[in-house]
């Protein structure tokens, strides 16, 4: 990150004009003096989310009434917080304290200005961001209300990319969001309100990736402040931390200097109560101790809450987090594609999903069907391994593959699966999987080891210290970026250690492709080989979110969707209503 003289700019595309597209939705132009790119080189804006939303539907009731300023909003904090956005299973307090450079629509992922007022393509390897002036960091030492400017933004880019790994004495793999901004070389503050990003190669998903909720910005001094004491944190977001008791209670109060969205935040304060037990959280909502609850991972609670809180509004949509079962390919048996494919053919995906989610789920192959490039749930259901009607035939092929790999009827196959023990859905899904394999292959030995919480799981799976792992993967707002993160040799979420040169080459080509049809064709090739030749992962199903909210709170219809904010971090956008 360097301060530079005023940039001499060439012909550019302004983000305010085509921001809905991200780089995935516009050709890189500006190399010559002409204005727009030819029509056939552009990627049209895709209505990400429409495909799956039409399959499952979106329920988002509008609460009538006038928004009222003030009041307190309380929700349950079930997961342990991890506070460095570059690493960990969540971004901790930062979605409350700070903001994203660009925002994506909750359903469509269409981009809109946020910290950046415009985003431009100067040439295939040069991106220009204009930062809104007047943004202030909270009035807390050492910042004391100083301006948040281009130098902070440039620092965030370089830190997310892992450029400071050596200086911080951290492994490059620590910076898990690096593949979100693949091909990043450097960021420079041209002036107080202009950032120039240089890429090593074109990246067709760079802009859309910046709307991922793990890409929260921070003041450039945060590495010096450290991430151990959240009471020292500050940002430009709608909230300030007023109280922090680890795993017990976090209280936020309104940041009076917040300026990005008029009137926000509406509430005076937000409280996250630490309730580790999902059933205790259900009881808290039933007794009106908390104002909203996400019961996606605890679907059996819905009938109870329908009785105890019949007044609550129900919001539901296709989640952006799929359930997966990932083999560690460094474990010898899983290096063999035949073993990995045999397990796929033996799994009864519908049995696992319906036992937990009833009918509130869909099939998926390599990423969520919200993406235009992804195969539809109907197509996936028709494929070997997924199709319930051909399960007996598929299991015969499974046995043949295992025998050819040296494990006749599963004999000699033994492994442990780790998961988050506090997730009832994960444990139930694994128990179902274990039972299926025991029925099909009685001599196969599968053990389940639930870990205490997400933080404990994160400490193990990010190092690849497992034989198989079950969890949930929250996708970024771009299909190519999602699969690069998870399956490219250099992918920052490639916890299973999968490495296939042909896959790497295909995805490297796809990320640099800006023609919509060509991009989709490349992704189609990827999905075909994922199904027939690679099988690095088992995406079990995609559940449907179910959130209940106190009826006097409005605004949730604006944050509901596959790429929405959720009951906790969306607090600045919701409000009490005067009816």
Label each residue range with its predicted role.
Residues 71-123, 158, 165, 232-235:
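N-terminal lobe/hinge region of extracytoplasmic solute-binding protein
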Residues 1-11, 16-27:
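N-terminal secretory signal peptides
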Residues 138, 198-216, 230-280, 301-322:
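Aromatic-rich, solvent-exposed beta-strand/loop patch
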Residues 120, 130, 152, 166-220, ...:
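Surface-exposed binding/hinge segments that line
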Residues 117-167, 196, 284, 333-335:
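Aromatic- and charge-enriched surface segment that lines or borders ligand/interaction sites
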Residues 361-404, 422-428:
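Structural transition elements
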């Amino acid at each position: 990150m360097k301060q530079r003289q005023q940039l001499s700019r060439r012909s550019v595309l302004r983000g305010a004009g085509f921001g809905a597209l991200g780089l995935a939705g516009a050709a890189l132009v500006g190399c010559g003096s002409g204005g727009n790119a030819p029509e056939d080189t552009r990627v049209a804006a895709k209505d990400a989310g429409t495909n799956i939303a039409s399959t499952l539907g979106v329920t988002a009731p509008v609460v009538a009434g006038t928004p009222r300023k003030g009041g307190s909003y309380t929700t349950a904090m079930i997961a342990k917080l991890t506070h460095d956005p570059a690493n960990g299973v969540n971004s901790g307090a930062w979605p409350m304290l700070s903001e994203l450079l660009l925002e994506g629509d909750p359903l469509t992922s269409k981009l809109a200005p946020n910290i950046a007022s415009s985003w431009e393509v100067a040439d295939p390897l040069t991106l220009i961001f204009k930062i809104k002036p007047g943004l202030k960091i909270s009035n807390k030492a050492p910042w004391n209300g100083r301006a948040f400017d281009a130098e902070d933004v440039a620092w965030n880019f370089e830190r997310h990319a892992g450029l400071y790994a050596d200086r911080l004495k951290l492994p490059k793999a620590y910076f898990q969001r690096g593949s979100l901004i693949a091909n990043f070389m450097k960021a420079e503050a041209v002036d107080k309100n202009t950032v120039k990003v240089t890429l090593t190669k074109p990246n067709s998903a760079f802009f859309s990736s910046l709307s991922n909720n793990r890409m929260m910005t921070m003041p450039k001094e945060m590495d010096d402040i450290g991430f151990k004491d959240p009471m020292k944190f500050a940002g430009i977001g709608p909230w300030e931390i007023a109280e922090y008791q680890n795993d017990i209670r976090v209280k936020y109060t309104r940041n009076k200097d917040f300026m990005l969205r008029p009137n926000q935040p509406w509430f005076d304060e937000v409280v996250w109560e630490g309730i580790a037990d999902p059933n205790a959280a259900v009881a808290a909502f039933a007794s009106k101790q908390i104002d909203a609850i996400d019961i996606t991972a605890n679907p059996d609670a819905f009938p109870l809450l329908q009785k105890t809180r019949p007044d609550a509004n129900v919001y539901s949509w296709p989640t952006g987090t799929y359930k997966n079962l990932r083999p560690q390919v460094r474990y010898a048996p899983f290096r063999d594609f035949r073993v990995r494919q045999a397990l796929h053919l033996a799994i009864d995906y519908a049995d696992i999903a319906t036992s937990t989610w009833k009918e509130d789920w869909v099939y998926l192959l390599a990423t969520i069907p919200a993406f235009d490039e992804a195969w539809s749930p109907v197509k996936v259901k028709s494929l070997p391994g997924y199709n319930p009607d051909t399960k007996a035939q598929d299991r015969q092929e499974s046995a043949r593959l295992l025998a050819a790999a040296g494990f006749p009827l599963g004999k000699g196959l033994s492994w442990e699966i780790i998961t988050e023990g506090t997730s009832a859905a994960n444990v139930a899904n694994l128990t179902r999987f274990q039972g299926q394999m025991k029925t099909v292959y009685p001599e196969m030995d599968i053990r389940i080891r639930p870990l205490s919480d997400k933080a404990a799981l994160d400490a193990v799976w990010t190092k690849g210290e497992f034989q198989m792992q079950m969890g949930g993967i929250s996708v970024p707002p771009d299909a190519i970026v999602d699969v690069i993160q998870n399956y490219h040799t250099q992918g920052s979420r490639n916890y299973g250690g999968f490495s296939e040169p042909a896959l790497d080459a295909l995805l490297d080509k796809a990320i640099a492709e800006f023609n919509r049809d060509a991009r989709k064709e490349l992704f189609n090739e990827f999905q075909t080989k994922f199904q027939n030749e690679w099988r690095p992962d088992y995406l079990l199903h995609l559940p449907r979110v179910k959130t209940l909210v106190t009826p006097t709170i409005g605004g949730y219809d604006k944050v509901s969707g596959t790429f929405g904010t959720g009951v906790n971090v969306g607090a600045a956008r919701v409000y009490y209503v005067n009816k």
